[in-house]
């Protein structure tokens, strides 16, 4: 029987650290999640914001180079998390990487991967005070495509419609990624404002 350890520590008001350890796994996953009340426009902005943040950062302002750097660290990756929990939305960033015990000569890659994860969150790639326009446009179109794709996913679409009926008039009825119209109207200012708000109060 494998021993699984679990601990949860309060680091500050509204901030907690959860550790789950199971020695049967050879890889690690670090997730940073922001929980905030569900609101259709905010949910849409959050859904796009997280994808823009993981594209690059101030230290590595190139999407290709960031991907290459992580791949060079034993196939590590940085991604996003987006979903709903009742009347709340959970969005954030995550990093997956092999455990340091399994690298060649015990190379410590965990610190390097988590450094880039934190860079993406706290030191985003800004050009003259705004997110890189190229990546902004790219991620906006990807979000629109994802929203459109939900209509073609019969099971997912049916679940979304059921939620709208069951939770009519309640935050839980809202989609975790918003609508095409809302996505099309997201501005740079929306992302910058929401990024600041998440760090300060989510």
Predicted features, each with a name:
Residues 151-154:
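Charge/polar-rich, low-complexity and marginally structured segments
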Residues 52-55, 73, 116, 120-124, ...:
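Structured segments of extracytoplasmic/periplasmic soluble domains
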Residues 67, 123-147:
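Acidic/histidine-enriched alpha-helical segments
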Residues 79-83, 148, 192-194:
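Catalytic micro-motifs at enzyme active sites that drive phosphoryl/nucleotidyl and oxygen chemistry
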Residues 1-73, 192-202:
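His/Glu-rich zincin catalytic helix
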Residues 26-44, 64-119, 156-178, 202:
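M16 family metallopeptidases and their MPP-like homologs
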Residues 56-59, 101-104, 123-133:
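Short, polar/flexible loop-turn hinges at active-site or ligand-entry regions and domain interfaces
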Residues 3-6, 161-201:
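Histidine-acidic residue clusters that define the catalytic metal-binding segment
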